[in-house]
Amino acid sequence: MVCDPNGDDTGRTHATVPVSQLGYEACRDELMEVVRLLEQGGLDLDASLRLWERGEQLAKRCEEHLAGARQRVSDVLAGDEAQNG
């Protein structure tokens, strides 16, 4: 999900992957990891701020994915009502 704040590669998705390229599940999973790391504590201020900023970006992207899904459902339901109405 994220790189270790000390720069060590944890073997998960790097924080350098643009948020815009992540699907909903990847954003959600990385956001959960960011929250876990922040709650765990022990990070210096700069590392905490970098994680927090990444978390904000991930949360916004998750909301965009969910808004798109809601719109798709609304569109399908509106189309069904128009055909049956």
From Swiss-Prot:
It is found in: Cytoplasm. Keywords: Cytoplasm, Exonuclease, Hydrolase, Nuclease. The keyword Cytoplasm applies. One of its GO terms (molecular function) is exodeoxyribonuclease VII activity. Its main location: cytoplasm. Heterooligomer composed of large and small subunits. Belongs to the XseB family. This is Exodeoxyribonuclease 7 small subunit. The lineage of its organism: Bacteria, Bacillati, Actinomycetota, Actinomycetes, Mycobacteriales.
